[in-house]
């Protein structure tokens, strides 16, 4: 049985060489899908406090909570953007430090836009509610849109 498994391992390893588009061996990691999903979840919680949280959001802890979430988003998104830059033409000739610096700038510019994004969302939510006769509340719009 051990030889069969070893033979299979060798066949799979050969396939990594032959099908190199589907393997990234000894290369910097590109993007981490699981981390990106966590980042999106945290951004959604910042955009809609109290809607997608597991626990009640208390006003006395809101400043701490928002700060903690922004720190998480900034740290992890910076790493993901930096990895993307390192693997794209945007920053292919950059050093790792330059890619990280550029990523930090891009991420902070995005984070600075959160208040404006919230304004747009507020307007969009009201418009969706006004245009949907089946909607019972703006909360329903937030939970159900898009699809």
Regions found by a protein language model. Give the residues of each.
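Terminal amphipathic alpha-helical/low-complexity segments used for targeting or macromolecular assembly
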Residues: 1-146
């Amino acid at each position: 049985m051990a030889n069969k498994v070893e033979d299979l391992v060798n066949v799979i390893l050969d396939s990594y060489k032959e099908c190199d588009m589907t393997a990234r061996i000894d290369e910097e990691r590109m993007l981490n899908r699981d981390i990106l999903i966590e980042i999106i979840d945290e951004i959604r919680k910042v955009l809609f406090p109290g809607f997608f949280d597991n626990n009640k959001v208390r006003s006395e802890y809101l400043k701490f909570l928002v700060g903690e979430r922004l720190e998480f988003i900034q740290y992890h998104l910076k790493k993901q953007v930096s990895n993307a830059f390192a693997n794209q033409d945007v920053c292919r000739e950059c050093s790792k430090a330059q890619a990280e610096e550029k990523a930090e700038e891009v991420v902070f510019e995005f984070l600075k836009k959160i208040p404006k994004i919230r304004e747009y969302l507020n307007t969009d939510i009201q418009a969706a509610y006004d245009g949907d006769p089946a909607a019972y509340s703006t909360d329903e719009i937030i939970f159900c849109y898009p699809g």
